[in-house]
Amino acid sequence: MDKGLLTRLEDVRHKVADKAHTVAGQASELVVNAMGFLGVPYKRGGTSAESGFDCSGFVRAMYQQTVGLLLPRSADQQAAATQTIDKKELQPGDLVFFNTMRRSFSHVGIYVGYGKFIHAPRSGAEVRVEDMSISYWARRFNGARRVATSSTGENLVSAKQ
């Protein structure tokens, strides 16, 4: 068999394996990175540590920096672009959504494990970790989603291309 062909096939195999990588494989890095932003102030429409974050801007920035994926900008668009999972299936790095403005998927955070999530909560507050079982969050829980690393998703664009 042609050695050049074998080399090309091996390159393709590695590229496919890289594409098949899941966010779960980078979950601890994602959570550790997100924890590095604890205390950053909330800013409506904010997308950076320098200016401050809103909830979806925080999630988007963490995924772009750590996983190399550019999620949609708003919480409801992020929910639509990700895979629905059962709350019992939550793993670190998954997204958790809440109805905080009398509409579904109006708030988003990153699940960190042990029933807790990290998020940019509201004006006057800072990025922090909270317990999902606290009555405020438990009553408003809207659903859990998992982010796939496939760059073929309609609303999911790979930032590392």
Where are these regions (language model features)?
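Intrinsically disordered, low-complexity
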Residues: 1-41, 147-161
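Aromatic- and glycine-rich peptidoglycan recognition patches
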Residues: 7, 11, 105, 112-161
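Solvent-exposed, polar/charged alpha-helical surfaces in well-ordered, non-transmembrane soluble domains
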Residues: 28, 32-36, 57-61, 65, ...
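Catalytic cysteine-centered active-site loop
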Residues: 40-92
